Amino acid sequence: MPNLGQLVSEVQSNLQGYTLRQDRITWLATPGGISATDLTIQIGSADNLAKGIVQIGNELLWVNSFDRQNLTLNVAPGFGRGYMGTTPSPHAQNAQIILTPTFPVTMIQQALNDTINSLYPKLFGVANTTFQYNAAQIAYPLPDDTRDVLFISWQTPGPSKEWLPTNRWRIDRMANVAAFNTTKTVNIYDKIVPGRTVQVYYSIIPNNLTNLNDDFAGVTGLPESSRDVVTLGAAYRLLSYIDTGRINLSSAEADLADTKLPSTAGASASKYIFALYQQRLQEESVKLQDRFPIRVHYTK
């Protein structure tokens, strides 16, 4: 199952045409690595060095100057570490250094999470909880992240191990917090054998991915097959801002680029990827609705 780090690599590879476009790369040669506050960095190669932004791991740094003979980068004091809102962090020796990254890792992660946040209600995560049925009790607490109840069943007594569906229930999204320690409860009106286990499947808003080793399906709650929906959504979001860096008045380099590519090339590519995203989103939505259809039930 893919994790956040693999999704980031997939988006990077797709946006760079697999191997067609390659960022300039060197490596961190400081013995023992660097701390979160070090401003001098030894590197393994002086090729293609330039003043500006570099990326180490998830952190962006602003390089104020460099020394080709001693193979060192000098980071600007104050704002140079954790540049553009990234988090300063220690980095190990031989860590990859990307010079002027086209698509910084933090921006890709944000685009992935923005896509995940936009999926609900077309796509939703699925979770479940269990509790013991009490004949004297009607309302049972549900987890705080519950959005809707999808299916309820209970385990019958005896060796059959059968789980019967429950058809008389009602969800309360404004339950008394003092009574249940949550605002989500389910009222069960079916006749269930006391002491038996009741299982509730419920929908949740997909969770964001935070750490590079976060498992996609395990953390978000989304189906494994929706992975490409998220990567396509991140790709069209990132591509939609490419043209802003090529506006004629921004730099001499932008003027030169405009002689080779039209100024709307990024927007055109973004629209194409967006169409693919919409198609896959619709396909996954139909699959999820087929797996968890709206079930007729009584509310009293």
Label the model's feature ranges.
Residues 39-48, 57, 77-84:
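A structural micro-motif recognizing beta-strand termini
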